[in-house]
Amino acid sequence: MTIDVLKEWWYYFFQCTECRRCSVFCPYGIDTAEITIMGRELLNLLGLNIDWIATPVANCYRTGNHLGIQPHAFKDMLDFFVEDIEDITGLAIEPSFNKKGADILFITPSGDVFADPGTYTCMGYMILFHYLKVKYNLEVTWSTYASEGGNFGFFTSHETMKRLNSKMYAEAKRLGVKWILGGECGHMWRVIHQYMDTLNGPADFLETPVSPITGTRFENAASTKMVHIAEFTADLIKHNKLELDKSRNDGKIVTFHDSCNPSRGMGLLEEPRYIIKETCNQFYEMPSNTIREQTFCCGSGAGLNAGENMELRLAGGLPRANAVKYVHEKHGVNMLGCICAIDRAALPTLMEYWVPEVDVTGVHELVANALVLPGEKERETDLRGDPLKSMEGDDAE
Protein backbone atom coordinates (compact mmCIF):
# COMPACT_ATOMS: atom_id res chain seq x y z
CA MET A 1 0.00 0.00 0.00
CA THR A 2 1.44 3.37 -1.06
CA ILE A 3 0.18 6.94 -1.22
CA ASP A 4 -0.23 6.59 -4.98
CA VAL A 5 -2.38 3.48 -4.53
CA LEU A 6 -4.49 5.30 -1.93
CA LYS A 7 -4.99 8.16 -4.38
CA GLU A 8 -6.04 5.70 -7.07
CA TRP A 9 -8.53 4.08 -4.69
CA TRP A 10 -9.82 7.47 -3.70
CA TYR A 11 -10.40 8.58 -7.26
CA TYR A 12 -12.18 5.32 -8.08
CA PHE A 13 -14.42 5.04 -5.02
CA PHE A 14 -15.37 8.72 -4.98
CA GLN A 15 -16.41 8.94 -8.61
CA CYS A 16 -18.97 6.14 -8.23
CA THR A 17 -22.46 7.43 -7.44
CA GLU A 18 -23.53 3.96 -6.23
CA CYS A 19 -26.47 4.13 -8.64
CA ARG A 20 -26.13 0.38 -9.42
CA ARG A 21 -27.04 0.69 -13.11
CA CYS A 22 -23.96 -1.34 -13.99
CA SER A 23 -25.26 -4.21 -11.83
CA VAL A 24 -28.34 -4.47 -14.08
CA PHE A 25 -26.15 -5.30 -17.08
CA CYS A 26 -23.18 -7.09 -15.47
CA PRO A 27 -23.04 -10.66 -16.88
CA TYR A 28 -21.44 -11.85 -13.63
CA GLY A 29 -24.02 -10.22 -11.36
CA ILE A 30 -21.44 -8.04 -9.62
CA ASP A 31 -22.94 -5.16 -7.62
CA THR A 32 -20.24 -2.51 -7.94
CA ALA A 33 -22.01 -0.23 -5.46
CA GLU A 34 -21.45 -2.77 -2.69
CA ILE A 35 -17.75 -2.84 -3.56
CA THR A 36 -17.70 0.97 -3.48
CA ILE A 37 -19.41 0.97 -0.09
CA MET A 38 -16.76 -1.33 1.39
CA GLY A 39 -13.94 0.60 -0.28
CA ARG A 40 -15.22 3.86 1.15
CA GLU A 41 -15.52 2.30 4.59
CA LEU A 42 -11.86 1.29 4.47
CA LEU A 43 -10.85 4.78 3.35
CA ASN A 44 -13.03 6.28 6.06
CA LEU A 45 -11.18 4.23 8.69
CA LEU A 46 -8.01 5.94 7.46
CA GLY A 47 -9.65 9.33 7.94
CA LEU A 48 -10.17 9.90 4.23
CA ASN A 49 -13.53 11.34 3.28
CA ILE A 50 -15.01 14.50 1.81
CA ASP A 51 -16.49 17.37 3.77
CA TRP A 52 -19.83 17.15 1.97
CA ILE A 53 -20.26 13.69 3.55
CA ALA A 54 -18.36 13.89 6.85
CA THR A 55 -19.91 17.14 8.09
CA PRO A 56 -23.54 16.07 7.50
CA VAL A 57 -22.81 12.79 9.31
CA ALA A 58 -21.47 14.67 12.34
CA ASN A 59 -24.36 17.13 12.25
CA CYS A 60 -26.94 14.37 11.98
CA TYR A 61 -25.49 12.52 14.95
CA ARG A 62 -25.40 15.74 16.97
CA THR A 63 -28.72 17.43 16.14
CA GLY A 64 -30.73 14.95 14.08
CA ASN A 65 -30.27 16.41 10.59
CA HIS A 66 -27.52 16.97 8.03
CA LEU A 67 -27.42 20.74 8.37
CA GLY A 68 -27.00 20.75 12.14
CA ILE A 69 -30.21 22.71 12.59
CA GLN A 70 -31.51 22.88 16.15
CA PRO A 71 -35.11 21.76 16.90
CA HIS A 72 -36.51 25.29 17.22
CA ALA A 73 -34.98 26.30 13.87
CA PHE A 74 -36.47 23.22 12.20
CA LYS A 75 -39.90 24.21 13.50
CA ASP A 76 -39.32 27.82 12.40
CA MET A 77 -38.78 26.67 8.81
CA LEU A 78 -42.08 24.82 8.72
CA ASP A 79 -43.75 27.87 10.27
CA PHE A 80 -42.45 29.93 7.34
CA PHE A 81 -44.07 27.41 5.00
CA VAL A 82 -47.33 27.77 6.95
CA GLU A 83 -47.32 31.48 6.10
CA ASP A 84 -46.63 30.78 2.42
CA ILE A 85 -49.40 28.19 2.32
CA GLU A 86 -51.85 30.63 3.89
CA ASP A 87 -51.01 33.21 1.21
CA ILE A 88 -51.79 30.64 -1.50
CA THR A 89 -54.80 28.83 -0.01
CA GLY A 90 -56.18 31.24 2.58
CA LEU A 91 -55.88 28.50 5.22
CA ALA A 92 -53.69 28.62 8.33
CA ILE A 93 -52.62 25.01 8.72
CA GLU A 94 -51.14 23.68 11.96
CA PRO A 95 -48.46 21.00 11.53
CA SER A 96 -47.94 18.69 14.48
CA PHE A 97 -44.53 18.35 16.17
CA ASN A 98 -43.35 15.60 18.54
CA LYS A 99 -46.93 14.63 19.35
CA LYS A 100 -47.23 11.56 21.53
CA GLY A 101 -50.03 9.23 20.53
CA ALA A 102 -50.17 10.48 16.93
CA ASP A 103 -51.20 7.93 14.32
CA ILE A 104 -48.11 8.25 12.14
CA LEU A 105 -44.57 9.66 12.46
CA PHE A 106 -43.40 11.40 9.29
CA ILE A 107 -39.69 11.62 8.49
CA THR A 108 -38.27 13.26 5.37
CA PRO A 109 -34.81 14.39 4.21
CA SER A 110 -33.90 17.79 5.62
CA GLY A 111 -33.09 18.97 2.11
CA ASP A 112 -36.84 19.26 1.58
CA VAL A 113 -37.03 21.67 4.50
CA PHE A 114 -34.10 23.92 3.65
CA ALA A 115 -33.41 23.95 -0.11
CA ASP A 116 -35.43 24.81 -3.22
CA PRO A 117 -37.09 23.13 -5.01
CA GLY A 118 -37.41 20.60 -2.20
CA THR A 119 -39.12 23.24 -0.07
CA TYR A 120 -42.13 23.11 -2.38
CA THR A 121 -42.23 19.34 -1.95
CA CYS A 122 -42.20 19.90 1.81
CA MET A 123 -45.11 22.32 1.49
CA GLY A 124 -46.82 19.57 -0.48
CA TYR A 125 -46.47 17.16 2.44
CA MET A 126 -47.87 19.75 4.83
CA ILE A 127 -50.89 20.49 2.64
CA LEU A 128 -51.61 16.78 2.20
CA PHE A 129 -51.42 16.11 5.95
CA HIS A 130 -53.73 19.07 6.64
CA TYR A 131 -56.25 17.65 4.17
CA LEU A 132 -56.10 14.21 5.80
CA LYS A 133 -56.53 15.67 9.26
CA VAL A 134 -59.56 17.77 8.28
CA LYS A 135 -61.25 15.10 6.16
CA TYR A 136 -60.32 11.91 8.00
CA ASN A 137 -58.99 13.02 11.41
CA LEU A 138 -55.59 11.45 10.65
CA GLU A 139 -52.83 12.78 12.90
CA VAL A 140 -49.40 12.81 11.26
CA THR A 141 -46.62 14.28 13.39
CA TRP A 142 -43.17 15.62 12.51
CA SER A 143 -40.17 15.11 14.78
CA THR A 144 -37.58 17.73 15.67
CA TYR A 145 -35.32 14.93 16.95
CA ALA A 146 -35.54 12.51 14.03
CA SER A 147 -35.56 15.42 11.61
CA GLU A 148 -33.57 13.71 8.86
CA GLY A 149 -34.56 10.82 6.64
CA GLY A 150 -31.32 10.81 4.68
CA ASN A 151 -28.44 8.75 6.02
CA PHE A 152 -24.95 9.77 4.96
CA GLY A 153 -23.64 6.97 7.11
CA PHE A 154 -24.41 4.94 3.99
CA PHE A 155 -21.44 6.74 2.39
CA THR A 156 -19.04 6.22 5.31
CA SER A 157 -19.49 2.97 7.26
CA HIS A 158 -22.13 0.43 8.21
CA GLU A 159 -21.70 1.30 11.90
CA THR A 160 -22.35 4.99 11.25
CA MET A 161 -25.31 4.10 9.07
CA LYS A 162 -26.73 2.01 11.93
CA ARG A 163 -26.30 4.80 14.48
CA LEU A 164 -28.00 7.42 12.33
CA ASN A 165 -30.82 5.08 11.36
CA SER A 166 -31.56 4.15 14.96
CA LYS A 167 -33.08 7.55 15.75
CA MET A 168 -36.11 6.80 13.57
CA TYR A 169 -37.15 3.79 15.62
CA ALA A 170 -36.18 5.50 18.87
CA GLU A 171 -38.45 8.45 18.13
CA ALA A 172 -41.30 6.25 16.90
CA LYS A 173 -41.12 4.32 20.17
CA ARG A 174 -40.94 7.48 22.29
CA LEU A 175 -43.98 9.03 20.59
CA GLY A 176 -45.99 5.82 20.58
CA VAL A 177 -47.06 6.06 16.93
CA LYS A 178 -48.48 3.12 14.99
CA TRP A 179 -46.01 3.22 12.10
CA ILE A 180 -43.66 5.51 10.17
CA LEU A 181 -44.22 7.35 6.89
CA GLY A 182 -41.15 8.40 4.90
CA GLY A 183 -40.75 11.28 2.46
CA GLU A 184 -39.34 11.47 -1.05
CA CYS A 185 -35.68 10.48 -0.86
CA GLY A 186 -33.28 8.16 -2.63
CA HIS A 187 -30.51 6.62 -0.54
CA MET A 188 -32.76 7.01 2.53
CA TRP A 189 -34.95 4.30 1.03
CA ARG A 190 -32.05 2.04 0.04
CA VAL A 191 -31.06 2.02 3.71
CA ILE A 192 -34.63 1.52 4.91
CA HIS A 193 -35.67 -1.11 2.40
CA GLN A 194 -32.49 -3.20 2.31
CA TYR A 195 -30.69 -2.58 5.62
CA MET A 196 -32.98 -1.11 8.29
CA ASP A 197 -34.54 -4.31 9.58
CA THR A 198 -31.20 -5.99 10.25
CA LEU A 199 -29.48 -2.77 11.37
CA ASN A 200 -31.96 -1.74 14.07
CA GLY A 201 -34.88 -4.17 13.93
CA PRO A 202 -37.09 -5.89 14.59
CA ALA A 203 -39.46 -2.97 15.20
CA ASP A 204 -41.96 -5.17 17.01
CA PHE A 205 -43.24 -2.20 19.04
CA LEU A 206 -44.83 -0.82 15.84
CA GLU A 207 -47.82 -2.14 13.93
CA THR A 208 -47.67 -3.54 10.42
CA PRO A 209 -48.64 -0.43 8.42
CA VAL A 210 -52.29 -0.26 7.44
CA SER A 211 -53.82 2.90 5.98
CA PRO A 212 -56.47 4.07 8.47
CA ILE A 213 -58.25 5.75 5.56
CA THR A 214 -58.39 3.01 2.91
CA GLY A 215 -57.67 -0.10 4.96
CA THR A 216 -54.81 -1.08 2.65
CA ARG A 217 -52.14 -3.21 4.31
CA PHE A 218 -48.68 -2.18 3.08
CA GLU A 219 -47.06 -5.61 2.80
CA ASN A 220 -43.76 -4.20 1.52
CA ALA A 221 -43.35 -2.44 4.87
CA ALA A 222 -44.43 -5.36 7.06
CA SER A 223 -40.87 -5.81 8.31
CA THR A 224 -39.55 -2.24 8.61
CA LYS A 225 -42.92 -0.66 9.55
CA MET A 226 -42.04 2.30 7.31
CA VAL A 227 -44.04 3.24 4.19
CA HIS A 228 -42.91 5.39 1.25
CA ILE A 229 -45.15 8.41 0.85
CA ALA A 230 -45.55 7.76 -2.89
CA GLU A 231 -47.08 4.36 -2.11
CA PHE A 232 -49.27 5.93 0.59
CA THR A 233 -50.54 8.75 -1.64
CA ALA A 234 -51.07 6.51 -4.67
CA ASP A 235 -53.26 4.30 -2.49
CA LEU A 236 -55.32 7.31 -1.38
CA ILE A 237 -55.84 8.40 -4.98
CA LYS A 238 -56.74 4.88 -6.12
CA HIS A 239 -59.49 4.74 -3.48
CA ASN A 240 -60.81 8.22 -4.42
CA LYS A 241 -59.90 9.72 -1.06
CA LEU A 242 -58.36 12.91 -2.48
CA GLU A 243 -60.23 15.62 -4.38
CA LEU A 244 -57.91 16.70 -7.18
CA ASP A 245 -58.05 19.39 -9.85
CA LYS A 246 -55.53 18.39 -12.51
CA SER A 247 -55.98 21.66 -14.39
CA ARG A 248 -54.01 23.48 -11.70
CA ASN A 249 -50.89 21.82 -13.09
CA ASP A 250 -51.69 22.80 -16.68
CA GLY A 251 -48.68 24.51 -18.15
CA LYS A 252 -46.45 21.86 -16.60
CA ILE A 253 -45.49 19.29 -19.22
CA VAL A 254 -43.98 16.60 -17.04
CA THR A 255 -41.58 13.71 -17.42
CA PHE A 256 -40.36 11.48 -14.60
CA HIS A 257 -36.83 10.59 -13.54
CA ASP A 258 -36.65 7.25 -11.73
CA SER A 259 -34.38 8.00 -8.80
CA CYS A 260 -31.82 5.18 -8.61
CA ASN A 261 -32.43 3.87 -5.12
CA PRO A 262 -36.26 3.85 -5.07
CA SER A 263 -36.32 2.26 -8.53
CA ARG A 264 -33.45 -0.24 -8.54
CA GLY A 265 -33.25 -0.46 -4.75
CA MET A 266 -36.92 -1.08 -3.94
CA GLY A 267 -38.90 -1.35 -7.18
CA LEU A 268 -40.98 1.80 -6.68
CA LEU A 269 -41.75 2.31 -10.37
CA GLU A 270 -45.50 2.64 -10.93
CA GLU A 271 -46.69 4.62 -7.90
CA PRO A 272 -44.99 7.96 -8.70
CA ARG A 273 -46.13 7.75 -12.31
CA TYR A 274 -49.68 6.99 -11.22
CA ILE A 275 -49.67 10.05 -8.95
CA ILE A 276 -48.33 12.31 -11.69
CA LYS A 277 -50.91 11.10 -14.21
CA GLU A 278 -53.70 11.71 -11.67
CA THR A 279 -52.50 15.24 -10.86
CA CYS A 280 -51.30 16.45 -14.28
CA ASN A 281 -52.84 16.46 -17.74
CA GLN A 282 -49.56 16.26 -19.66
CA PHE A 283 -47.04 13.51 -18.94
CA TYR A 284 -44.46 11.97 -21.27
CA GLU A 285 -41.96 9.18 -20.66
CA MET A 286 -38.30 9.40 -21.60
CA PRO A 287 -36.90 6.59 -23.83
CA SER A 288 -37.43 3.14 -22.31
CA ASN A 289 -33.72 2.36 -21.94
CA THR A 290 -33.27 5.44 -19.70
CA ILE A 291 -36.05 4.86 -17.16
CA ARG A 292 -37.38 2.36 -14.62
CA GLU A 293 -34.79 -0.31 -13.75
CA GLN A 294 -32.46 1.00 -16.45
CA THR A 295 -32.69 4.60 -15.24
CA PHE A 296 -29.67 6.89 -15.53
CA CYS A 297 -28.47 8.57 -12.35
CA CYS A 298 -28.38 12.30 -11.61
CA GLY A 299 -24.57 12.19 -11.57
CA SER A 300 -24.34 13.48 -8.00
CA GLY A 301 -25.47 10.65 -5.73
CA ALA A 302 -23.54 8.96 -2.92
CA GLY A 303 -22.33 12.28 -1.55
CA LEU A 304 -20.83 13.66 -4.77
CA ASN A 305 -23.15 16.68 -4.86
CA ALA A 306 -20.45 19.21 -4.03
CA GLY A 307 -19.21 22.23 -5.94
CA GLU A 308 -15.65 20.98 -6.25
CA ASN A 309 -17.00 17.95 -8.16
CA MET A 310 -18.90 20.06 -10.67
CA GLU A 311 -17.17 18.81 -13.82
CA LEU A 312 -17.60 15.19 -12.71
CA ARG A 313 -21.26 15.83 -11.81
CA LEU A 314 -22.15 17.45 -15.11
CA ALA A 315 -20.42 14.71 -17.09
CA GLY A 316 -21.97 11.94 -15.00
CA GLY A 317 -25.43 13.43 -15.40
CA LEU A 318 -25.16 13.93 -19.17
CA PRO A 319 -26.96 10.67 -20.12
CA ARG A 320 -29.96 11.71 -18.03
CA ALA A 321 -29.82 15.24 -19.45
CA ASN A 322 -29.79 13.86 -23.00
CA ALA A 323 -32.95 11.85 -22.31
CA VAL A 324 -34.64 14.95 -20.87
CA LYS A 325 -33.54 16.98 -23.87
CA TYR A 326 -35.12 14.38 -26.16
CA VAL A 327 -38.59 14.67 -24.59
CA HIS A 328 -38.21 18.43 -24.28
CA GLU A 329 -37.61 18.76 -28.01
CA LYS A 330 -40.23 16.14 -28.98
CA HIS A 331 -43.05 16.96 -26.54
CA GLY A 332 -42.18 20.35 -25.06
CA VAL A 333 -41.48 18.88 -21.62
CA ASN A 334 -40.65 21.68 -19.18
CA MET A 335 -40.78 19.90 -15.81
CA LEU A 336 -38.71 16.96 -14.55
CA GLY A 337 -40.34 15.10 -11.67
CA CYS A 338 -38.46 12.98 -9.15
CA ILE A 339 -38.80 11.43 -5.68
CA CYS A 340 -35.32 12.07 -4.29
CA ALA A 341 -33.90 14.99 -2.28
CA ILE A 342 -30.43 14.69 -3.82
CA ASP A 343 -32.08 14.72 -7.24
CA ARG A 344 -33.88 17.91 -6.29
CA ALA A 345 -30.53 19.38 -5.23
CA ALA A 346 -28.52 18.10 -8.21
CA LEU A 347 -30.87 18.06 -11.19
CA PRO A 348 -31.57 21.83 -11.25
CA THR A 349 -27.84 22.44 -11.82
CA LEU A 350 -27.72 19.68 -14.42
CA MET A 351 -30.78 21.05 -16.24
CA GLU A 352 -29.51 24.62 -16.05
CA TYR A 353 -26.34 23.54 -17.85
CA TRP A 354 -27.66 21.00 -20.38
CA VAL A 355 -31.40 21.71 -20.79
CA PRO A 356 -32.09 25.15 -19.26
CA GLU A 357 -35.74 25.18 -20.36
CA VAL A 358 -36.63 22.39 -17.88
CA ASP A 359 -37.32 22.84 -14.14
CA VAL A 360 -37.31 20.17 -11.42
CA THR A 361 -40.12 19.19 -9.05
CA GLY A 362 -40.98 16.67 -6.40
CA VAL A 363 -44.10 14.58 -6.94
CA HIS A 364 -45.88 15.92 -3.84
CA GLU A 365 -45.51 19.49 -5.04
CA LEU A 366 -47.73 18.45 -7.95
CA VAL A 367 -50.12 16.71 -5.53
CA ALA A 368 -50.51 19.84 -3.41
CA ASN A 369 -51.07 22.04 -6.45
CA ALA A 370 -53.96 19.80 -7.51
CA LEU A 371 -55.40 19.06 -4.06
CA VAL A 372 -58.69 20.87 -3.36
CA LEU A 373 -58.70 21.78 0.33
CA PRO A 374 -61.96 22.19 2.27
CA GLY A 375 -62.59 25.90 2.83
CA GLU A 376 -59.72 27.19 0.72
CA LYS A 377 -59.94 30.36 -1.33
CA GLU A 378 -59.76 30.22 -5.10
CA ARG A 379 -56.16 29.50 -5.98
CA GLU A 380 -54.43 31.97 -8.23
CA THR A 381 -50.90 30.56 -8.09
CA ASP A 382 -49.12 27.26 -7.64
CA LEU A 383 -46.83 26.62 -4.66
CA ARG A 384 -44.00 28.51 -6.36
CA GLY A 385 -46.13 31.62 -6.72
CA ASP A 386 -46.44 31.23 -10.49
CA PRO A 387 -49.91 32.12 -11.86
CA LEU A 388 -52.13 29.17 -12.71
CA LYS A 389 -52.77 28.78 -16.42
CA SER A 390 -56.48 29.49 -15.88
CA MET A 391 -55.58 32.76 -14.18
CA GLU A 392 -53.31 33.72 -17.07
CA GLY A 393 -56.31 33.33 -19.37
CA ASP A 394 -58.40 35.59 -17.16
CA ASP A 395 -55.67 38.23 -17.17
CA ALA A 396 -55.52 38.13 -20.95
CA GLU A 397 -59.23 38.87 -21.13
Say what each PLM segment does.
Residues 311-334, 345:
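A short, acidic, amphipathic alpha-helical segment used as a generic capping/interface helix at domain edges
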Residues 160-164, 241-257, 303-315, 377-397:
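A polyampholytic, Gly/Pro-enriched intrinsically disordered region
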Residues 1, 24-43, 303-317, 345-356:
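Iron-sulfur (Fe-S) cluster-binding segments and ferredoxin-like electron-carrier domains
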Residues 110-112, 259-260, 342:
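Residue-level signal for short, function-critical loop segments
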Residues 265, 294-297, 306-307, 343-349, ...:
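Short active-site-adjacent structural elements
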Residues 204-248, 288-293, 352-390:
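Short, flexible loop segments at boundaries between secondary-structure elements
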Residues 1-200, 204-209, 384-397:
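Iron-sulfur-cluster electron-transfer modules
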Residues 136, 141-143, 237-242, 249-312:
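Redox- and metal-dependent alpha/beta enzyme cores, enriched for Fe-S-associated oxidoreductases
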